[in-house]
Design a protein with these regions (language model features):
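Conserved core of the PLP fold type I
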Residues: 62-163
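N-terminal "arm"/small-domain region of PLP-dependent enzymes with the aminotransferase-like
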Residues: 1-63, 161
Length: 163
């Protein structure tokens, strides 16, 4: 494939796969996993109440949902006692992290995170032209002092702390 239409940022990125899906790992090892914990799934599946709610809502599945998620935001705002304009609804963590980076990181901006944090966050930073600085863990935990020091030294625009 010719890359003459790609942006310079995309052309400069190394070929990489930011996240290897559980299905790909299963193909590599030749068997299904009994628990896919890395995919944030539990081995019990959804509760019967969730299955019933999905079944009841499935009659309208053919309709596009409200793109503003108005009703969901109102329910969450009431539950957490915060303004609904403080809530962002997205189609998953990858997209939400992409929005975060897109909102705050311009070409050349410095961003600090830890080695081993969420892989697609790094992908978004590099994909939008940010400069990524990674800190090692300390005793299998985020090294907060290293993150703070690196952010200060690099004048980072954004610091991502994973949980």
């Amino acid at each position: 494939m010719s890359d003459h239409r790609l942006t310079n940022i995309v052309k400069s990125l190394p070929a990489s796969i930011p996240f290897v899906a559980p299905e790909e790992h299963e193909r590599i090892v030749g068997k299904k996993f009994s628990a896919r914990l890395g995919a944030n799934e539990n081995c019990y599946g959804p509760s019967p109440k969730v299955l019933e709610a999905i079944k009841n809502l499935s009659v309208d599945i053919w309709k596009y949902p409200d793109p503003t998620a108005h009703d969901l935001k109102k329910v969450l705002a009431n539950f957490y006692n915060i303004p609904d304009n403080n809530i962002v609804i997205g189609e998953g963590i990858d997209a939400l992290l992409g929005y975060l980076v897109r909102l705050f990181v311009q070409v050349g901006d410095n961003v600090v995170t830890s080695n081993g944090s969420y892989p697609t966050f790094n992908y978004h930073v590099e994909g939008f032209g940010g400069q990524l600085f990674k800190c090692d863990y300390l005793n299998d935990k985020e090294d907060l002092q290293s993150l703070i020091d690196t952010a200060s030294k690099t004048k980072a625009k954004l610091v991502y702390i994973s949980n």
